[in-house]
């Protein structure tokens, strides 16, 4: 499926969707390291809370969105860091504490892409920690922070996703977009 999306559809996508479809397990979250392809399951117990997935009903084609542009931008970040003697295999290897030192080496929009990747990596690990501690309110806070980063640093949300997220937060403990973004679905 991944080869088809990349080679025939022209979408420079990752492997998360395929892994979720093939390895998804009821009442569990799948923690996937996309660089090593190692994965593990974590029990999802929300107590009296429910997990809802909403759809914008706004059609879009990822190949016609800025999705591939975001992939290229992340590649540019790696190249610029390499020119500055910072060699990494993927952006998530950058530590949060190193972001301040790196900021002046990148144009603002590329720094924000990097900051999203690095802080999202931490949010994922914090989410797993909160999940293992059954801290549902912390899970909601992390979802909110993630969406704000996707909106402001990675810039992949859009009007429809932001509207749903904003409305959901009025009655939910947390809300974030899921999928590739750009306000719609294929």
Question: What label would you give each PLM region?
Answer:
Residues 63, 183-185:
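Local cysteine-cluster metal-coordination motifs and their immediate loop/turn environment
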Residues 1-39, 162, 175-181:
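Alpha/beta catalytic cores of group-transfer enzymes, especially the acyltransferase/condensing modules
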Residues 173, 185-186:
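FabD-like malonyl-/acyl-CoA
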